[in-house]
Amino acid sequence: MIQIKRALISVSDKSGLVEFAKFLNQNGVEIISTGGTLKLLKDNGIAAIAIDDYTGFPEILDGRVKTLHPKVHGGLLGVISNPAHKQKMEELKIPKIDLVVVNLYPFLKTVSKPEVQLEEAIENIDIGGPSMIRSAAKNYKHTLVLTDPNDYKKIQNLISSSGISEEISASYMRKAFSHTAMYDAAISSWFYKQSGEVFPDVLNLSFIKKQKLRYGENPHQAASFYEPLFTKSDFSPLQGKELSFNNMLDFDAAFHISSLLPENTVCIIKHLNPCGIAYADNPLEAFQLARRTDPISAFGGVIGIKGQVNGELATSITENFVEGVIAQKFTQEALEVFSKKPNIRLIEIQDFKEALDELDLRPIHHGLLIQDRDYTTITEKDLKVVTKKQPSPDDIRGLMFAWSCVRFIKSNAIVYTEENATLGIGAGQMSRVDSVQLGANKALNVGLSVVGSYVASDAFFPFRDGIDALAKAGAKAIIQPGGSVRDEEVIQAADEHGLIMVFTGMRHFRH
């Protein structure tokens, strides 16, 4: 058991400290402290020794050197059960320090400010704090280290009851090393980001557990959601069952798609694939257009809405089973409608804007693949008309909408659209012609005609069979990357059928 007789306290986050320090004082614990922490303690009538009085050495270099002293680290690292350590500490008059309460300069908070200057960031890099934390954590069998104000009450209760066992101290040791590792990762990441280097030679990733999820991809799998240090989610859950792993993935997909499309866009997601996308003058009309694409697949889906959900739209949504809705805003009337279906998960995210600097991380066996997210867009000027038949301005708008949709569909991907709504989606097939046929059949199965439709393909057509199938289905115009060794054959097929075809020069594979 660790007997706490002496504590060193030096914190940036002072929440809960006064009550905890008073408790230590009342239990006969001698307190050593520094700077602003010392002032807070003394202002509240808590006895404490200044660090320079304790070490006999003044703070120097504008406070950059306070606790980097053998009397401090000897007291933290000394193994009192080791006779040689004990003898040397007695010889050098180094008392044992049994408890360290330290949290670090607010580097993350500082660099999160939009106009932070390099000098300010540097001055908020803590040196002495991490050193004390690591020393105490290394010697956890004899020294307790606390880095989180939320733990003060637990330690008070333990000191008052069963005491501090080695097992308990070990749990705080693990937390302490995670704390300093996260701190160093934040500093490293920020400086790399300032340099413009996206893929550093050494990658440090730190994530904080945000919440435990209902379960993983399947009910027998456990799962949790973690947030990266520099990104705070503004997802606001308003109602509904606990989120599962799959729910989070589908909500994320719904957000990504809606955020990159025009105002009043609605998309419906099932297993990470959109089964309907549309935009209109208002979200209700867009929802009705998106749902008609594939009402069967929309059953149990997640809906993303770039706009406001009112009572009328909420009523329309609740006529069928859905897992959840993510939108910019829910009116009070909408919330009242949804409250009658309390299992529907509602998430509000007012800033429906994509973080364009995000990276795409994929774990693989023995490694991690990292790439830029596929956010690059094209304009009408990037289109190359390759057929004899030329597109009208309306055709260009329809093709651009189809192209904006196909990038979100699993490869091989084909999407049939009108100017502002999907008609049929062929997703995830191993051959492109199968996706062509699947998309047309999906539309026909729900009574939608693809005659005169705009068709987007996420990658080039390797053979003319896909073009022949599109012509047979009644498509009017095709947008695709181009780049196949058989492009001339494919263009010839389009000309034979009187189709419009444009090349983008950009592929949108999605695995």
UniProtKB/Swiss-Prot annotation:
Family as reported in the entry's similarity comment: Belongs to the PurH family.
Species in which this protein is naturally found: Leptospira interrogans serogroup Icterohaemorrhagiae serovar Lai (strain 56601)
Designated name of the protein: Bifunctional purine biosynthesis protein PurH
UniProt-listed NCBIfam families: PRK00881.1, purH
SUPFAM superfamilies the record matches: Cytidine deaminase-like, Methylglyoxal synthase-like
SMART domains: AICARFT_IMPCHas (SM00798), MGS (SM00851)
Keyword hit for Zinc: no
Keywords per UniProt: Hydrolase, Multifunctional enzyme, Purine biosynthesis, Transferase
One Pfam family linked to the record: MGS
GO cellular component, one term: cytosol
Domain MGS-like: 1-147
Protein's GO biological process: 'de novo' IMP biosynthetic process
EC number: 2.1.2.3, 3.5.4.10
Catalytic activity: (6R)-10-formyltetrahydrofolate + 5-amino-1-(5-phospho-beta-D-ribosyl)imidazole-4-carboxamide = 5-formamido-1-(5-phospho-D-ribosyl)imidazole-4-carboxamide + (6S)-5,6,7,8-tetrahydrofolate; IMP + H2O = 5-formamido-1-(5-phospho-D-ribosyl)imidazole-4-carboxamide
Recorded domain comment: The IMP cyclohydrolase activity resides in the N-terminal region.
Listed GO MF terms: IMP cyclohydrolase activity; phosphoribosylaminoimidazolecarboxamide formyltransferase activity
Known pathway: Purine metabolism; IMP biosynthesis via de novo pathway; 5-formamido-1-(5-phospho-D-ribosyl)imidazole-4-carboxamide from 5-amino-1-(5-phospho-D-ribosyl)imidazole-4-carboxamide (10-formyl THF route): step 1/1; Purine metabolism; IMP biosynthesis via de novo pathway; IMP from 5-formamido-1-(5-phospho-D-ribosyl)imidazole-4-carboxamide: step 1/1
InterPro entries, A to Z: AICAR_Tfase_dup_dom_sf, Cytidine_deaminase-like, MGS-like_dom, MGS-like_dom_sf, PurH-like
